[in-house]
Structures are given as C-alpha cells and as structure tokens.
Amino acid sequence: MKRILVVSGLSGAGKSTVARVLEDIGFFCIDNLPPALLNDFMVLLSSSSIDKVALVVDIRSAQLGNAVQAIKKLVDNYSNIVTVLFLEASDEELLKRFATTRRRHPLEGQLSLQEAISKEKELLRDMKEMSVVIDTTGLDIHTLREKIGSLLKEEAQFVIRIRSFGFKYGLPADTDFIIDTRFLPNPYYDRKLAQLNGTDQEIVNFFSKYPVVEDFIQYTYKLLHIAATRYKSEGRPFMTVSIGCTGGRHRSVYVAEKLSKILKDRFYVYVEHRDVNK
C-alpha cells in the first residue's frame, strides 16, 4: 500500500529539514508542490511504482485559503494512505531562526515579523486540526530524525492519536471521540497550581488525591480499547481521540497522558496537547 505524507506548517518550522530526513529514510520527496496540483499528482502516482512519497506544500499568502481546502480534500479522498504532518515551533524559536537566516517571512510585507507569525498561525489553524503536529522547538537534526522515525515506526500499524484541548478555544474539527473532563476537580483554582500543566508532578499529585479521576480514566480506557480493537479489525489506519477541559491546560492534559501510557501497552499512540501553552 502506498504511503503519502504531506509536510506543511509554519514558515521557519523546518519543512525542508524534515523533507531531507524523510528522503534519508526512503521517501521520494517533492518540495514546494503547489496545492492546486495535489489531485493531478495523485492521479499520476496511482500508476507509479513509488510507494512512499513526501510532499512539501509551500503555502504563500495568496494561496492560503485554497491550500487548506486542497489538502483537506486530499485527506478526505485518500484517508487510508495520506497523513498530514504540521510543523510548528514557539514564537521565540521562529524569531531566532529568521534572525539567524536573515530570510523574510512570506507574510511579512507591511507586518512586523511577530505579526506575520501570528497571522500565519491563525490562517493555518484549520490545517493544524487535521494534522499530526510536530513541535520542532529546540530540536537538533538528530533528535528530529528520531522523532520522525518514531512517528513512522511500523507504518502499517494501527495508530491512536490522543489530543488534549480547551473547550474555550473551540472543538477539534477532525476527531472520532470527544471526551469531556470538565466535571473533574480543577487545579486551576489553586493559585500555586494555576500556571502549571497536566504533565507537571504537582498536578499529578493533585489528581492522585481524587479516586474519581482514576475511576474515570479506567472506564474511558475500556471504552477506547473496545473502539480501537474494532477500528483496527475494520482496517482503519488510526483513531483520533480528543480530550477536553475548559482551558486545555490541566485536566485534559493529565487524562490524555495517563490514557496514552495505558494504551501504549497494546497500541501505537501519538499524543499532542493543542492548547497547553495558551
């Protein structure tokens, strides 16, 4: 079966670097493919002997809206073989990279560099929702290679994508399950814990005091295990589970991390925290 990776994301986040990594591990890479040609390329690929392809889609200001729609259509039409990788990095990291390379951001124009970065994030929000997100902040080439290798490990293997999010920032657009954790005890109201997130030990200690949290995690695990087993038997390549709390910082992150650790005993699991830094 063919495997198509669409590499997209924020300017300066490392798309070209990721393309080189993918090329090194056996992918045929096409850089800067115009989104309008995606469908034509898939038609050509259907009669080709090439099995693993990475398409780096370079999205410029005049094409943003059409590009997002073109990639969404591609995913809808070829969901069994297409995965979108969305590369991002912190604002501080992006500012540093642009300063180092002395390249202009494609949206800069009349905007400052910081404004251009913020504008691009907003324009690509829908793209990010349908993608597997890779944060390249602070990653050297060797660590990035390991991260991508881990992501692509056992390519034919069924994957569970677990995403934490905050309801206040909107529902995820592309998901199979939405799990609401807003009824659980909230560490936000403890001033010492408010600025931490669900991966911090202090938050772990907080939730360990409430049996209802562990009960909820165990019941949710049983539900997801049943669903994942069925999805896998039906030939589905992945299952996406979105776990939400009010702001996406404490409860949803903690539950997502706990569930991923349990599910990893039986499935390949990929975790991302959409709103943890907002």
Curated annotation (Swiss-Prot):
ATP binds at residues 9-16. GTP binds at residues 58-61. SUPFAM superfamilies: P-loop containing nucleoside triphosphate hydrolases. It comes from the Bacteria. Keywords: ATP-binding, GTP-binding, Nucleotide-binding. Pfam families: PapZ_C (PF22740), RapZ-like_N (PF03668). HAMAP family: RapZ_like. PANTHER family: RNASE ADAPTER PROTEIN RAPZ (PTHR30448:SF0). This is Nucleotide-binding protein Tlet_0523.
